[in-house]
Amino acid sequence: MEGGAYGAGKAGGAFDPYTLVRQPHTILRVVSWVFSIVVFGSIVNEGYLNNPEEEEEFCIYNRNPNACSYGVTVGVLAFLTCLVYLALDVYFPQISSVKDRKKAVLSDIGVSAFWAFFWFVGFCFLANQWQVSKPKDNPLNEGTDAARAAIAFSFFSIFTWAGQAVLAFQRYQIGADSALFSQDYMDPSQDSSMPYAPYVEPSAGSDPTGMGGTYQHPANAFDAEPQGYQSQGY
């Protein structure tokens, strides 16, 4: 993983798609995006059955409309979430503020863990309703492959989203690279708590400017000895 602030280099560099697609969290987002399409696509296309004796369609999962609605809703929202965070992955290296990067990574941790939990609930819900479904409701076994696919990819999505949360936490642990970023640095000349320039101890040598060296009196300033009285000739 790249050095820098929260797993990305210094802001302002050129966009590198090759580096983007090689990042583990970006790969997992794409995989999660595909899985979400499989889940809600399978339910929308083949998750509702027609019975000649009934006017309305019913959900293939034990005739429970909540099961189909849950799978479609979670799949669509997860699909949109993947798109949002894929866009964030593209924009993330351009974020110059360390605090903004921190917020983005923390949101990634929370959202990824949230979706891992909801996919776990969805897998358990769909699997349970499929298990208790009555064969007489679907004597021709229509849509059974799609129903099983939705359950399977709900299960796989648990791990892809949990993996995103783990990778985001690792990026959070990296933190800010002090060599490239500093969020607490203040220019001493702009620091109001330091009104005066710091004292610099003068050097022992001569000071050609006369500003900081030690004072040296002239060599003959006080060395002249008093001379005796000399009479004046008149």
UniProtKB/Swiss-Prot annotation:
Give the bilayer topology. Answer: Multi-pass membrane protein
Q: Which residues cross the membrane?
A: 24-44, 72-92, 105-125, 149-169
Q: Residue ranges of the MARVEL domain?
A: 20-173
> Region Disordered: start and end of each range?
201-234
Annotated signal peptide:
none
Q: Which GO terms describe its cellular component?
A: melanosome; neuromuscular junction; Schaffer collateral - CA1 synapse; synaptic vesicle; synaptic vesicle membrane; terminal bouton
On this chain, the residues bearing N-acetylmethionine are 1
Keywords from UniProt, A to Z, are: Acetylation, Cytoplasmic vesicle, Membrane, Synapse, Transmembrane, Transmembrane helix
- Name a single GO biological process: protein targeting
* Family of the protein in this entry: Belongs to the synaptogyrin family.
The protein's name:
Synaptogyrin-1
Its source organism is: Rattus norvegicus (Rat)
